[in-house]
Amino acid sequence: MSSETPSPVRPERRPKAETEGRGASALRLRSGRTDVSVRGKITPNAPLAPLVWFKSGGSAEWLFEPRDEDDLTSFFKGLDPDVPVMALGLGSNMIVRDGGVPGVVVRLGKAFAKIEKLDDVTLRCGGGASGILVSSTARDAGIAGLEFLRGIPGTVGGFVRMNGGAYGREVQDILVEARVALRSGTVETWPLEKLGYTYRHSDVPEGAVVIEAVFRGSPGDPEAIGAEMDAIARAREESQPLRSRTGGSTFKNPPGHKAWALIDAAGCRGLKLGDAQVSEKHCNFLLNLGSATSGNIEALGEEVRRRVHDTTNISLEWEIQRVGLDR
C-alpha cells in the first residue's frame, strides 16, 4: 500500500491476502462510515511470531503501521469502537497466543521514534523510540537519571503504559507527561498523576496507544552517564539469557520477595515443557529452545506458578503480557 496516497479500507471488500490461511474478518467500521483511509500499511493475517522475542504465536487479524499521528487517529475515528486494538512495540515482554490476536494490532514505526531535547534536562520522546535510544540520547545531552532505560528492552509506548523499571528506578521517577491516542481517535495529554502508576501498572485504558512522552532527568556528565549505562549492560549480559528466545522478566516481584528466588526455591530452575524451559541462568526468564508453541510457554509459566504457590503459598503474578486466543 502506498505510503503517500490514502487508501480506503472497506468492510465489504476482502483483501486478496484474506483468502490465504484462516482469513481475517472484514474490518468493521464505525456506524455511518463506508471506508477509512490510511496512509500507512495495513495487513490482514499478519504473522506476529517474527515480531516478538519468543518467536512463537499466531497472526494479527489486522496489523496497522500508521504513517504518522494523524494517520493513527483518523483510523481510530473510522474504526468500529467494538473492534479490539492492541499496541505492539519491540515484542519483548509478550506472549502471543497460538490462535492469534483478533482485531487490530498497532505497531509504531520510525515516525514515532523521534526524540527532541526540550531543555537541559528534558526530552520529548516518540512512543516508538527504544529504551536504548532514549538513554543514549540523554547521555549525549548530559541528562542523568535515564540510564536505567538502557536495561528495559522495549519502547516508550510500552514502558510508559506499564511503568517499566530496572535497577531500582521506574518510569514514574522521570515522567512529566504522556500523550495518549484514545480509541475514539482523540489525543489527550496526561500529566504524571493521571496515569495512576503502581508497580508495573498504569491507568492507560485498553485500546489506547501512548504516542509520546516527556521525561525529565538532572544535569550530568556524559562520561559518567555512559559508564553507568555500560555497567547496566554488563550486568544484564552476566545475569540474563539475552541471546535466547525469551520474553524478559516473566513474573512480578511479590512484596518483600524476588520472583526468581521463589522460583528457584520451588525447584523450577531448568524445568522444561516441550521446547519451553525455565532459564538456568535467570529463572524468572522463560525460553523457547527452538520449536516451543506459545501454549507450551504459557503452560510452563502456569506450572511454575503452581509449584511456587504449593511451596510458599505465594501467588506469582504475570508480568509478561499474554494476548490473543488459544488455538
Language-model regions, residue ranges each:
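Short, basic and Ser/Thr-rich N-terminal targeting/leader segments
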Residues: P81, L88-L90, I174, S244-R245, ...
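Anion-binding (especially nucleotide phosphate/pyrophosphate-binding) glycine-rich loop
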Residues: R33-V156, A166
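A generic local secondary-structure boundary/capping motif
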Residues: M94, S135-A138, L146-R150, N163-E170, ...
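Conserved active-site and cofactor/substrate-binding residues in soluble primary-metabolism enzymes
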Residues: A49, R67-D70, K110, A129, ...
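Intrinsic disorder/low-complexity segments
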Residues: M1-S37
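Conserved beta-strand segments that form the floor/walls of ligand-binding pockets within enzyme
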Residues: K55, R107, R124-G126, E147, ...
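Structural signature of FAD isoalloxazine-binding scaffolds in flavoprotein oxidoreductases
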Residues: F64-E69, I95-A113, V160-P191, P205-E212
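Phosphate/pyrophosphate- and phosphate-bearing ligand-binding catalytic cores of soluble enzymes
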Residues: T43-P44, M94, A181-R327
